[in-house]
Amino acid sequence: MSLKQHTQTIFRQQFDRESDITIKAPGRVNLIGEHTDYNDGFVLPCAINYETVISCGKRGDRQIRVIAADYENQQDIFSLDAPIVPHPEYRWADYVRGVVKHLQMRNADFGGADLVICGNVPQGAGLSSSASLEVAVGQALQSLYQLPLSGVELALNGQEAENQFVGCNCGIMDQLISALGKKDHALLIDCRTLETRAVPMPENMAVVIINSNIQRGLVDSEYNTRRQQCEAAARFFGVKALRDVEPSLFFSIQDELDPVVAKRARHVISENARTLAAADALAAGNLKLMGQLMQESHISMRDDFEITVPPIDRLVEIVKSVIGDQGGVRMTGGGFGGCIVALMPLELVEQVRTTVAQEYPAHSGGKKETFYVCQASQGAGLC
């Protein structure tokens, strides 16, 4: 049974009527452009065919009633006419409540709704299950009530809900690619202006995500430290963000910076240049160059930003040994564990899967990987 059929069936069972519409919003993976988003830089993600699906219907009153199909049909009910506060027990409900509250703060005019939510975006793998949920809830209410909100506004609304209501710091990339993703394309995003450019993916190309299943320890504290180091480097150069520092200027005076801060800045400045070059390489179908840029990105994360761990480095090497210059591979996400992303011809996927299964556990303390084969998918909309 598809997610759409599943949510529609539960809607019928729980609410004794048919849903009005069913919508979806995808998760994402970032192909290149790591830790550049909060430096006003560039990222190159694509939406993936793992998604949050919501079947929904209007109500005649001002109640929002939500069923979480993935949590044994737990239910949350709250009123649009009372202050919306965090749920005392259900963490998932805060993402829904936060999106609704921030839509109200945008003066969106909508009434009550019944929602049944289901998803298959892996949680805790860095594939943006939370952004997918936020965009899906916003899209559901927009579609039910014809709200005059653009995809960018729905993405910003989700980001605000996560930052201010749920209390998790995040950039705009995850929500933006979920809202605006385009089938068979990656999306080059300027994180300062929020301008986007769709970049076609080569045909017969798989996006493979491999979860190392190494728990991401230290990620919050180290993330904050990296962010502070980047801000210190920007202050040194007298600019708003490292996005504004030309590589030639940086390399001419990097010796005047604190050595650790210089390494962090070198990653961000070079990663921005790599991301722009990668968008052009991908559009031209130049997989050899794309692979080189992804390899340089990983080395920079390992040596300059220092956010990889040995099992992740080994996982990247194992995949690279199979795909050679026919694609690219690197760690993706915040670091200290999590996932790697690889672009490769479809015909190499099974060889990569087999080789990783044979070789990786010896380098991970016996942990086995989780393997996802994805396609670049369409952003949020009707299901």
From Swiss-Prot:
GO cellular component, one term: cytosol
PROSITE patterns on file: GALACTOKINASE (PS00106), GHMP_KINASES_ATP (PS00627)
Compartment(s) where it occurs, according to its Swiss-Prot or TrEMBL record: Cytoplasm
Pfam families referenced in this protein's UniProt entry, alphabetically: GalKase_gal_bdg, GHMP_kinases_C, GHMP_kinases_N
Gene3D superfamilies for the chain: 3.30.230.10, GHMP kinase, C-terminal domain (3.30.70.890)
Reactions catalysed: alpha-D-galactose + ATP = alpha-D-galactose 1-phosphate + ADP + H(+)
Pathway where this protein functions: Carbohydrate metabolism; galactose metabolism
Name the record gives this protein: Galactokinase
Organism: Yersinia pseudotuberculosis serotype IB (strain PB1/+)
